[in-house]
UniProtKB/Swiss-Prot annotation:
Its cofactor is heme b; FAD. FAD binds at residues 188, 204-207, 394-397. It catalyses: 2 nitric oxide + NADPH + 2 O2 = 2 nitrate + NADP(+) + H(+); 2 nitric oxide + NADH + 2 O2 = 2 nitrate + NAD(+) + H(+). Belongs to the globin family. Two-domain flavohemoproteins subfamily. In the C-terminal section; belongs to the flavoprotein pyridine nucleotide cytochrome reductase family. One of its GO terms (molecular function) is oxygen carrier activity. It comes from Bacillus cereus (strain ATCC 10987 / NRS 248). Consists of two distinct domains; an N-terminal heme-containing oxygen-binding domain and a C-terminal reductase domain with binding sites for FAD and NAD(P)H. The record marks 84, 393 as: Influences the redox potential of the prosthetic heme and FAD groups. It is an enzyme of class 1 (oxidoreductase). PROSITE patterns: FAD_FR, GLOBIN. The active site is at 95 (charge relay system), 135 (charge relay system). NADP(+) binds at residues 273-278. The keyword NAD applies. This is Flavohemoprotein.
């Protein structure tokens, strides 16, 4: 239990964190990786280089300081981060290392006096305990469910399928021949990649793109081509070098962006690009469980060349009365224009969306590039969709949609 004095001191640093939060977290990671380079085997190097991880941590530290007197408010965020930590294999023994480096960064960047550092040290201990407790439960649950396991388990690529010019699916079965644990549609796994010539292991999270209950997991990976940045190292390696018969270490499914199976409301699934992957899991699950809920499936892509799983979704639309699928192309090819194989050219806009969704009293799920998600979030808000019915997933560190 933190004293009133400690709470007061921590809350007094909120303006400082608002101003210098990213500077502090940037310095924190510099200290962390220089003194503990082995942790580079856990963290996503690309997110570090792009500053996304630093921003995400700054947001989390700011929220912790703001609500240090009522941490229940940020428990949903703690759980969301906890899922990511569990999937990466972050353990209780890592937290003291992080705490020491964070306090050093606060001192170096902000010149914080000992009184502030001591208060933050106490506060960090309480916050770390919350993470450790929640993550311990997650590890326990993942390991003890049927077909479950702890940390990483070797999976064999039994099938590799090209879904579009940029997206390829990998079907994964356990090397040990055992069962795979079930998951909730929308969840992801971490895949561990060791690239020849690279010093450190690369970990990447990929949404499971098929319904649970199979003998395999399916991930569908976009080959990331850099614009003013290098190409995606891991996605290109998977596309170009990983073949059927190869082995990949995989963590048990995790994540809190999940389909609400208890709701009876209609479902609207909106995706941009590779954001289609968790939506495919949700759509396939609703079909396989014989759900009678109306499903509106809206996908945005450049054109048919980059549009993954188009034929599968169209087949479900044709076969099931409750499924309606719509496609939006921002750069249709001449063939697309000739064949008229899409519903709208340009972006997903409120006026068009309003004509195809069954009702605003529905559960809305969306995923895609950050700019796309900000646009969809604003559009749904403008249409009057209740916040509790809006669900979304970031590929990478969480960011603000405001």
């Amino acid at each position: 239990m933190l004293s009133e004095k400690t709470i007061e001191i921590v809350k007094s640093t909120v303006p400082l964190l608002q101003e210098k939060g990213v500077e502090i977290t940037t310095r924190f990671y510099e200290i962390l990786f220089s003194e503990h380079p082995e942790l580079l085997n856990i963290f996503n190097h690309t997110n570090q280089k792009k500053g996304r991880q630093q921003q995400a941590l700054a947001n989390a530290v700011y929220a912790a300081a703001t609500y240090i007197d009522n941490l229940e408010v940020i428990i949903p965020v703690v759980k969301q981060i906890g899922h990511k930590h569990r999937s990466l294999g972050i353990k209780a023994e890592h937290y003291p290392i992080v705490g020491t480096c964070l306090l050093r960064a606060i001192k170096e960047v902000a010149g914080a006096p000992d009184e502030v550092l001591n208060a933050w040290g106490e506060a960090y201990g309480v916050i770390a305990d919350a993470f450790i407790s929640i993550e311990a439960e997650m590890y326990e649950e993942a390991a003890h469910k049927e077909g479950g396991w702890k940390d990483f388990r070797n999976f064999v690529v039994v099938k590799k399928v090209k879904e579009s010019d940029v997206i390829t699916s990998f079907y994964l079965k356990p090397e040990d021949g055992g069962k795979v644990s079930s998951f909730i549609p929308g969840q992801y796994v971490t895949v561990q990649i060791n690239i020849e010539g690279e010093t450190y292991t690369h970990n990447r999270q990929y949404s499971l793109s098929d319904a649970p209950g199979k003998e395999y997991y399916r991930i569908s990976v976009k080959k990331e081509k850099g614009v003013d940045t290098p190409d995606g190292k891991v996605s290109n390696y998977l596309h170009d070098h990983v073949k059927e018969g190869d082995m990949l270490p995989v963590s048990a499914p995790a994540g809190d962006f999940v389909l609400n199976m208890d709701s009876t409301l209609p479902v609207v699934l909106i995706s941009g690009g590779v954001g289609i992957t968790p939506m495919m899991s949700m759509l396939n699950t609703l079909i396989e469980q014989d759900s009678k809920r109306n499903v509106c499936f809206v996908h945005a892509a450049l054109n048919s060349n980059t549009h993954a799983m188009k034929e599968h979704v169209e087949a479900l639309d044709n076969e099931y009365e409750q499924v309606k699928a719509y496609t939006c192309y921002s750069a249709p090819t001449e063939k697309d224009l000739e064949m008229k194989n899409f519903d709208k050219e340009g972006l997903i806009e409120a006026e068009w969306l309003q004509t195809i969704i069954p009702t605003t009293e529905a559960e809305f799920y969306f995923c895609g590039p950050v700019a796309f998600m900000k646009h969809i979030n604003a559009t749904l808000t403008d249409l009057g969709v209740k916040q509790e019915h809006i669900h979304y997933e970031f590929f990478g560190p969480a960011a603000s949609l405001q």
